[in-house]
Amino acid sequence: MNEAIIQLDHIDITFHQKKRVIEAVKDVTVHINQGDIYGIVGYSGAGKSTLVRVINLLQAPTNGKITVDGDVTFDQGKIQLSAEALRQKRRDIGMIFQHFNLMAQKTAKENVAFALRHSSLSKTEKEQKVIELLELVGLSERADNYPAQLSGGQKQRVAIARALANDPKILISDEATSALDPKTTKQILALLQELNRKLGLTIVMITHEMQIVKDICNRVAVMQNGVLIEEGPVLDIFSNPKEALTQEFITTATGIDEALEKINQQDIVKHLPANALLAQLKYAGTSTDEPLLNSIYRQFEVTANILYGNIEILDHIPVGDMIVVLEGQAENILAAEKALHEAGVDVSILKRGA
């Protein structure tokens, strides 16, 4: 089992502005394991960016304890490391941002090399390191191009190479795909996954998009008004969200609400027969492999008209979502519902026939 490389315990962050006291983060505890791709999701003002400054050791918490890679860095608002040790810890954490933060007057390779200016490597070693980093992010052929000559995705690749220059153990992505189109976003996420696997890099994804979490993360924390309201494996959170905000994020990411709006306009749903019901079926893991609808027809003579279906892979596990009209004798439908539950399927009745 991997150990936590980042431990935030009971973190409070309070700001004083004139006569106002702003509680930006309230009693947040998060443990991120080595090798995780960990998502922190929330709307603007949730406290995500403030929490980032705590994780990358730029912001001391008002209260609470921070441990990074086994070393306590802050405890009850006080620095626990020497200035030099704290600088070294910060070098263990790379950052990428929404707007890339590249220097316009420097080429791609010069932007990456800039991150090595305090390195103990020789000039030749630095030059070789830059070549290797640009190759790692798939941008070798653009080494001599300036940012103005690069696409958004290429700029972000340069930024990733720069963030990796000092061999960090942790990479923080602060809304790094928000300015990119969907296709480029997928390419950057695929690159981050590859770096996670190849380098054993721990990645923290700060985002307001649950789609990003769904595509890349293995664990997620949901924040609202400075409070962590829900946390756990992505599969568990998507399969069984507890909080209303989490459910809202998930329905946006899966598109189920939009599907339901269209389904409710269909004649079969508007005029649902008395011996039928509209149901949503959610299932994960091995239950996605079972021919469940065929099974309930054979066993209970209950037919299933599939109006919507979707299967996705979350953290390497298939997760399915389906909206169906089940039709048959009332007692048979009840028996079919029970059989589905026993097979690990979550059944939600959306509408019963009149």
From Swiss-Prot:
One of its GO terms (cellular component) is plasma membrane. One of its GO terms (molecular function) is ATP binding. It catalyses: L-methionine(out) + ATP + H2O = L-methionine(in) + ADP + phosphate + H(+); D-methionine(out) + ATP + H2O = D-methionine(in) + ADP + phosphate + H(+). Its main location: membrane. It is a peripheral membrane protein. Belongs to the ABC transporter superfamily. Methionine importer (TC 3.A.1.24) family. This is Methionine import ATP-binding protein MetN. The gene is metN.
